[in-house]
Every structure is written in structure tokens, then in C-alpha cells.
Amino acid sequence: MSNSNKDHFDMSDLGASLPAAAAALSAEDRAGLVNALKNKLQNLAGQHSDILETLTPQVRKRVDVLRELQSQHDELESHFFEERAALEAKYQKLYEPLYTKRYEIVNGVVEVEGVNEAPMNQEEDKEAGNEKGVPNFWLTAMKTNEILAEEISERDEEALKYLKDIKWCKIDDRKGFKLEFFFDTNPFFTNSVLTKTYHMIDDDDPILEKAIGTKIDWCPGKCLTQKILKKKPKKGSKNAKPIIKTETCESFFNFFKPPQVPEDDDDDDIDEDAAEELQNLMEQDYDIGSTIRDKIIPHAVSWFTGEAAEGDEFEDIEDDDDDDDDDDDEDDEDEEDEDDEEEEKSKKKSSALKVE
């Protein structure tokens, strides 16, 4: 590879070097929110070339060798990503029969051996006669997870009781994934499957490009993402009918209507605060999707029983302990500084007394 090629900045590499929140606004069909960022990166590329130009020939030669080593490393890393993808695909196929069996047990398609032999009193026996599978399995599993619990409103719970299964798969371009939520017939919406698809810029270092959700076909008066407000007319008003207003409300089902980046024509209307808020919303949306994919689907029963939540709590405690240790170190340093100051003051006082 020649030095001129090395110094060239390729904008196609943009996605591989940005954090998820920022890159959420930097794919090719996204709006001009990213143009400023690209300009900054191009300026940085220019600075990179300037730095190389300032090096002495001897140092430049050493840096060139280091860059060759980096190229070798990147090639090995590329092979690693390929092998990892193949390994993940292999085990995903091995998981499928287990997920199918889980679906059958949860939804009462098959019965577990020994269930009818379990001792029960008469009341329990009557209830068990009408009870199939594991009621509210997915609702309970999701509510046990801290991230998802914040998204599920009390109104959502009735609808989520009809959730039969959640699956995920990679999409065709292998730069993203799709979540599928399978619902039993219910009084809230007519869709049997709700999907959420995440398109990524780079599969190896996930960077969100855009997200697309299913349009939910709500039954009349059952939309959970909106609430109807009735306002009484003013006294003496000719129109005696109450004013009816529809307002968007918090709901898990807003997950299927993800935040969208505005079109190019609307670029001038977006200020810095709005752009930052949009970034945060897209990052939060991706966190929810990846939590369902990486935690809920593979470990659903552990979330249902609460065991997985306990494991998460231990991780949080360890993180908090690390933060506390850092704070303690800072406190110790402050105390040492204070001791040094007191000692210095004492020395000055002693010197003053001797002079007198």
C-alpha cells in the first residue's frame, strides 16, 4: 500500500469509526444533520495528513512500519469477524429446536411429563383445568428487565398477555436484524405478527442506520399509544357537547413506531437541541431492541423467574463498587493534600516564632 493511499480519507469508512448514538444520524439517506459531522471528520483527515508531513523522515519511516503492522492486524480482525459470524449462525440453528420446544410448553401445545401427577388441592385443580402452558410468560419476562419495564405501561399489560413468542433473525444484507412478536387473537389489534427491523451500517461494530416497525392495525377504541381526552365546554357556550382531543401517550407499542430522521427539505428547521434529542431517542430505541434480542429471547425463563434480574443487579453493584473505589481514592488524595497544607502551615509558624 502506497503512502498516498494511506493518507487518503475514505468517507465510506465513516460508519466503522463512530459511536452508535452519533452514527444513528450518519447513513447515506439520512438528513443534513450529519453533514456538519462529515465536514468535521474531513477536517480531521486533513489534520492527520498534516501530522505526517511534520514528522522527520526517520520518524515517518517508523510510523509507516507501524501502519503496515496495523494493516496486518486489521486483516486478521476481518477474518475473526467472518469466523465469529459463521459460529453465531451455527449455534443459532442449534438453538432453534430448543426455542420451538419452549414455545410449545409456554403456549400449552404440549404437556410436560408428570404435570398431572403433581399434588393439588381442589381449588387449584379447578384453576389448572382452564390453565394452559405458562400464562403471561413473555409479559412477566419483559417486566422483570429494568430497561423494558420502563416502557410497559399498565394499559399495555392486557395486550402483552396475548404475546405467544418473540424471535429474531439477521436480515438479508447481514447488516442488521429483525425482531418478530407473535400474538394470539386479541381485542386490541388485528396483526398476528408485529416486527421491528434494525438496519445497521456495520455488522461487526453495530451502528444504527435506521429502524422500521410494523404499522399496528388497532381495533376501534383500543389504540394503546393514544389517549382520548374529553373537555367540558365553557358555561354559556352554544356548543354543549364536550370537546374530544386525542393525545399521544407512553406505551410499549410506540416501539413499533421508531423515531425517524427528517427529510432533506427539513434540515434547516432542526436545531442542535432537536438533533441531540433525536440521537438520544434512536439510541434508546436500539437499546430496547438489542436487550430483547440479546437478553430476553435467549434467557426468557430466567427473566420470568427473576434469576436473570438478580444477575444484572450483581453486575450493577460491581460497577457501583468500582465508582466508589474511584471516589475513595480521590477522597484519600484530598485528605493527603490537606495534611500537607497543615504541615506546611505548622512549619511556617515555627519559623516565625524562632525569628521573634
UniProtKB/Swiss-Prot annotation:
The acidic domain is probably involved in the interaction with histones. GO terms for cellular component: chromatin; cytoplasm; nucleus. Gene3D superfamilies: 1.20.5.1500, Nucleosome assembly protein (3.30.1120.90). Residues 304-356 are annotated as: Disordered. Residues 34-88 form a coiled coil. One of its GO terms (molecular function) is histone binding. May modulate chromatin structure by regulation of nucleosome assembly/disassembly. Could function together with B-type cyclins in the regulation of microtubule dynamics. This is Nucleosome assembly protein 1;4. The keyword Amino-acid biosynthesis does not apply. GO terms for biological process: double-strand break repair via homologous recombination; nucleosome assembly. Pfam families: NAP. It comes from the Eukaryota. Residues 347-356 have a biased composition (Basic residues). Keywords: Chaperone, Coiled coil, Cytoplasm, Nucleus. A motif (Nuclear localization signal) lies at residues 230-235. SUPFAM superfamilies: NAP-like (SSF143113). Its main location: nucleus. Can form homomeric and heteromeric protein complexes with NAP1;3. Binds histones H2A and H2B in vivo. Also able to bind histones H1 and H4 in vitro. Interacts with CYCB1;1 and with alpha tubulin. It comes from Nicotiana tabacum (Common tobacco). A motif (Nuclear export signal) lies at residues 55-70. It is found in: Nucleus; Cytoplasm. Belongs to the nucleosome assembly protein (NAP) family. InterPro entries: NAP-like_sf, NAP_family. Residues 309-343 have a biased composition (Acidic residues).
